[in-house]
Design a protein with these regions (language model features):
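Amphipathic alpha-helical polymerization modules
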Residues: 1-121
Length: 121
C-alpha cells in the first residue's frame, strides 16, 4: 500500500483506526446474532477498504460507509445461521490487534511531530 503525499500520516492512521473500529463492530454484530435463525455472517475486506480510504482521503473525499458482504463457505446450522463463535472470537482478536497497532502508530506520529516542533529550541 502506497501512502500518498496528498494526505498526512495522521489522517491515514485515523482512517485505519476507523476501519479497525468498523471491523470490531461488524464482528460484535455477528456475535450478537449467533442465535438469530437464518442470519448469515458478514465480513469486510480490510485491505481493500484501507486502500479506498487512502485514495478517498487523497482526493479530499469524506470517509464513506464500509462495504460488507456475506461470508461464503461457512457451515450453517439447521436454522440457517452460519455464525461460528470461534471464528468471530479470532476476528475480534485480530481487529483488536489492528486497533492497538493504529494507536501505537498514532503515538509515534504525534511524538515525531512534537520532536520536529522542539528541534529548533
Amino acid at each position: 500500500m502506497s501512502m500518498g503525499i496528498e494526505t498526512t500520516m495522521g489522517e491515514q492512521i485515523a482512517r485505519y483506526l476507523d476501519l479497525a473500529t468498523a471491523e470490531t463492530k461488524l464482528t460484535a454484530a455477528n456475535m450478537a446474532n449467533i442465535d438469530t435463525p437464518g442470519y448469515r455472517t458478514l465480513g469486510m475486506d480490510f485491505e481493500a477498504e484501507m486502500r479506498s480510504a487512502i485514495d478517498d482521503a487523497g482526493q479530499g473525499k469524506p470517509v464513506r460507509r464500509v462495504q460488507t458482504h456475506t461470508v461464503d463457505g461457512l457451515i450453517a446450522r439447521p436454522d440457517g445461521n452460519n455464525v461460528s463463535m470461534d471464528r468471530e472470537s479470532l476476528n475480534l482478536a485480530e481487529a483488536q490487534l489492528k486497533f492497538k497497532t493504529g494507536v501505537a502508530l498514532l503515538r509515534i506520529e504525534n511524538q515525531r511531530i512534537l520532536d520536529a516542533i522542539h528541534a529548533d529550541k
